[in-house]
Amino acid sequence: AMDELWSSKAPVSCIHPGWESLSGREDVVESWRSIIRGGAPAIRCREPEVFLYGNTATVLCYEEVEGDFLIATNVFVREAAAWKMVHHQAGPTRGKPQDDPASEENPQVN
């Protein structure tokens, strides 16, 4: 699933919390495989905000991980008929999403 999410045409990058910056599709996708293989906890996207700039979109959201929250930025580009991720960055935040019953319907990231 992670392989399908990331762009195969544009340069990609990722900064996981506490990690150094990763560049290049192979390193980024392998980092996610490693996280998932390690029994990564469920991550839920909460309160996403989408900013559309033609064939590029930025999504800001909270990531809920075992009751704690990170703040994340995800950047997507349009490739043919699909949106593909080109950048992900998540880190600690003091904030947290408002209790919104609709946010429970947001899809799980992994």
Predicted feature locations:
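A beta-strand edge to alpha-helix "cap/lid" segment located at domain peripheries
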Residues: S7, V12-N110
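Solenoid-repeat scaffolds in large eukaryotic assemblies
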Residues: A1-M2
